């Protein structure tokens, strides 16, 4: 990562701090108050020792300074605790806001774009990388101001009693950030490489975990174990590289801090021996002046040491921000959002004229398309993989942008509110997604307010009731992660029940019977055929045998509809559909 990129990312990180600017300012103020209390502590301690040792004042006469010293200790501890709480709140507030922006961006991109990267990579981006920015906002940014203000405050406090000690501290302080910067230049790049390795490892591991059964069947288990081991070793090496830089910068910090404090101690030692006679304004070096300087010397460097500790939080945040900023600024041709709403819940009419469907990156996925699907009719999209069928479904769902005209009941789809339009849709895909905890919750996902009678009707119509008695807790059975406790056919029937429970104007089916056994396929298609008679329906399928009752079949190739008609006509026409049907029969 070059310097200009690091500066650009640092500016971006600072721009995000305005989200919680008030809390960050309070954190800085509390840090400054803590610095004042440190000076007060040192002054009380120095004066008490001066009175007791040099002036032989009885301890009873020093009760008030002792009491004030104890109160100062207690007050400083409370201020430090409060500052930590405020800093944590600021970091948490900013993290939540950035995560919300990322999730909104993912929603704009849509599922078609998200599927281009492994789920593990997205998890790393949304969770780990954003969380790794916390210390930058909670600690590093407030500490930047304190690393300047508190040392200057301490120098101002020491200067009236001994200017030589103040100059020693003032002269050695700039060496620390200078050498820290030299060491830390490679830290951000190391962290960036570390995050890339973590994202690859997360995606690699999650994909292999999901495909473990397939890998074992084909004898690839040992090879994939070695692949994961290699990726883990690469991540370990990159992590150790980051830690090596952290320990090196800590060593430099401690060296210069110890050297500076030692110089102050040597100066006062020789001054007390009478070997040095400067720095005390011709009044002699007092015990109070020496104690004040020596007590405050470590505190002078403490803000710089804290900044050095948190500097790696900055490097970590810069590394995390690299892919985040790239993702947030990637131009996406996301669908335009309108405000219009469909007034009716009746089946819809869909019309397309010179329709071109584009990906979020602006690439044409399908088109030109010209068709009309009257209200209440059922259309089937067939064609080879990659011909643009799923792209049309994604465009109708509002997940892909388009050029040309795509009208719903005469209203351009881009003029409709996406949230309002999707309330008129029901969807069943080839890979059922059941994110909720129980079977009941997954069916009620779209309509949490549905009655028990409506729920039972949906379960009956989708043939879920057929296997429900076999489940240990019936409809309240936990389905597990990725519906692990259900077979593929059972999970698909649950997805169908969810679609049937939600009254809709347009039913979209994306290969709903793919990968199902014969019995499950029969049950799923029976339920969907019955449901499709009550609304406009568009189904994508590769199974061409049972399409005789559908109103129209559209054959897609290279993003275009090249043939359309009823099953009886197309199957004997000798065209593309007849060719697909012949290939399908050969496969069977």
UniProtKB/Swiss-Prot annotation:
- Per its UniProt record, what InterPro entries does this chain match? AAA+_ATPase, ABC1_TM_dom, ABC1_TM_sf, ABC_transporter-like_ATP-bd, ABC_transporter-like_CS, ABC_transptr_CydD, P-loop_NTPase, Type_1_exporter
- Mapped to this chain, the residue ranges on the Cytoplasmic side of the membrane are 1-15, 58-136, 183-249, 298-573
Q: Which Gene3D superfamilies match?
A: ABC transporter type 1, transmembrane domain (1.20.1560.10), P-loop containing nucleotide triphosphate hydrolases (3.40.50.300)
Task: Look up what happens after changing residue 238 to G.
Answer: Exhibits significantly lower levels of cytochrome d than the wild-type
Q: What is the effect of changing residue 238 to H?
A: Does not affect cytochrome d levels
Q: Where do the annotations place ATP binding?
A: 373-380
User: What cystine pairs are annotated?
Assistant: none
Record PROSITE patterns:
ABC_TM1F, ABC_TRANSPORTER_1, ABC_TRANSPORTER_2
Q: How is its activity regulated?
A: ATPase activity is stimulated by various thiol compounds. The presence of heme leads to a further enhancement of thiol-stimulated ATPase activity, although a large excess of heme inhibits activity. Glutathione transport is inhibited by sodium orthovanadate, an inhibitor of ABC-type transport systems, but not by the proton ionophore carbonyl cyanide m-chlorophenylhydrazone (CCCP).
Name of protein: Glutathione/L-cysteine transport system ATP-binding/permease protein CydD
Q: Which organism is it from?
A: Escherichia coli (strain K12)
Question: What gene makes this protein?
Answer: cydD
């Amino acid at each position: 990562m070059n310097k200009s990129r690091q500066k650009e990312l640092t500016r971006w990180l600072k721009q995000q701090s305005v989200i919680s600017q008030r809390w960050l300012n309070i954190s800085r103020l509390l840090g400054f108050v803590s610095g004042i209390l440190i000076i007060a502590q040192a002054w009380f301690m120095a004066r008490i020792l001066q009175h007791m040792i040099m002036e032989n004042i009885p301890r009873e006469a020093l009760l008030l300074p002792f009491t004030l010293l104890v109160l100062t200790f207690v007050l400083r501890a409370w201020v430090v605790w409060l500052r930590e709480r405020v800093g944590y709140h600021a970091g948490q507030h900013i993290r939540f806001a950035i995560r919300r922006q990322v999730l909104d961006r993912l929603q704009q991109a849509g599922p078609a774009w998200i599927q281009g990267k492994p789920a593990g990579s997205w998890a790393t981006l949304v969770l780990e990388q954003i969380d790794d920015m916390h210390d930058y906002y909670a600690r590093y940014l407030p500490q930047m101001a304190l690393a300047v203000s508190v040392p200057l405050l301490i120098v101002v406090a020491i200067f009236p009693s001994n200017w030589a000690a103040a100059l020693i501290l003032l002269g050695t302080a700039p060496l620390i950030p200078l050498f820290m910067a030299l060491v830390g230049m490679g830290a951000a790049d190391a962290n960036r490489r570390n995050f890339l390795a973590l994202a690859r490892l997360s995606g690699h591991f999650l994909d292999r975990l999901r495909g473990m059964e397939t890998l074992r069947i084909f004898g690839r288990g040992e090879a994939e174990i070695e692949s994961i081991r290699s990726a883990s070793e690469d991540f370990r090496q990159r992590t150790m590289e980051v830690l090596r830089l952290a320990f090196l910068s800590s060593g430099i910090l401690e060296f210069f801090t110890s050297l500076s404090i030692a110089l102050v101690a040597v100066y006062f030692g020789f001054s007390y021996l009478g070997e040095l006679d400067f720095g005390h304004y011709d009044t002699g070096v007092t015990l109070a002046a020496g104690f004040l300087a020596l007590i405050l010397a470590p505190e002078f460097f403490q803000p710089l040491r804290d900044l050095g500790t948190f500097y790696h939080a900055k490097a970590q945040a810069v590394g995390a921000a690299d892919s985040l900023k790239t993702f947030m600024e990637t131009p996406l041709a996301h669908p335009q959002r309108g405000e219009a709403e469909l007034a009716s819940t009746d089946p819809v009419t869909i019309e397309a004229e010179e329709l071109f469907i584009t990906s979020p990156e602006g690439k044409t996925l399908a088109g030109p398309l010209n068709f009309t699907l009257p209200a209440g009719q059922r259309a089937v999209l067939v064609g080879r993989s990659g011909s643009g069928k799923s792209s049309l479904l994604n465009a109708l769902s509002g997940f892909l942008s388009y050029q040309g005209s795509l009208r719903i009941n005469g209203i351009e789809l881009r003029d409709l509110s996406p949230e309002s339009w999707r309330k008129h849709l029901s969807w069943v895909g080839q890979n059922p997604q059941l994110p909720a905890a129980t079977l009941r919750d997954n069916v009620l996902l779209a309509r949490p307010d549905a009655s028990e009678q409506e729920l039972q009707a949906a379960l009956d119509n989708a043939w879920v009731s057929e296997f429900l008695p076999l489940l240990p807790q019936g409809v309240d059975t936990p389905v597990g992660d990725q519906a692990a406790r259900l077979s593929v056919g059972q999970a698909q029937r649950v997805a169908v029940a969810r679609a049937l429970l939600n009254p809709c104007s347009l039913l979209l089916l994306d290969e709903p019977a793919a990968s199902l056994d014969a019995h499950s396929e029969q049950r799923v298609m029976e339920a969907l055929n019955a449901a499709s008679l009550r609304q406009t329906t568009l189904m994508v399928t590769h199974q061409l045998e049972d399409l005789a009752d559908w109103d129209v079949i559209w054959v897609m190739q290279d993003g275009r509809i090249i043939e359309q008609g009823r099953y009886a006509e197309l199957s004997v026409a000798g065209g593309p559909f007849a060719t697909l049907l012949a290939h399908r029969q050969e496969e069977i």
